[in-house]
Amino acid sequence: MRVEVFYVPNCPHHPTAVSQLKAVLRAEGIPVEIHEVSVTNTKAAQELRFRGSPTVKINGRDIAGESQEPESFALACRIYAGAKEVGLPPIEMMQSAVREARKGETT
């Protein structure tokens, strides 16, 4: 399983997202390294399909799913609709994505 967190420098939510993701992985018994990727320019944002900071991907898939909005990639904060703290992916979203990825690896 490949786990990545993409972020812009000085993102206030990046450290918390990584910490929560580590806790989810630990609780699920998955000893995997989290690759943290700093996105520092617009070209990189476009190449990485970066939808804002922080973005969590597992096996290359955005845990928030694919957006129905027109694609716009930029150096910006990310908003997670329905989250208690809108700048962080909900823990439940992380748990679901980790479980789904693990299930896909065992089938």
Tell where the protein language model's regions lie, with residue ranges:
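Extracytoplasmic thiol/disulfide redox context detector
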Residues: 1-2, 31, 100-101
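Acidic pyrophosphate-coordinating catalytic loop
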Residues: 43-49
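Non-catalytic, surface beta->alpha helical segment in thiol-disulfide oxidoreductase systems
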Residues: 61-102
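Conserved short-loop catalytic and cofactor-binding motifs
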Residues: 5, 9, 44, 82
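Short acidic DE-rich linear segments
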Residues: 105-107
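Local sequence-structure signature of Cys/Sec-based thiol-disulfide redox active-site neighborhoods
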Residues: 1-23, 27-28
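Thiol-based oxidoreductase modules, predominantly thioredoxin-like and allied folds used
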Residues: 31-42
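Structural micro-motif
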Residues: 49-57, 69, 73-74
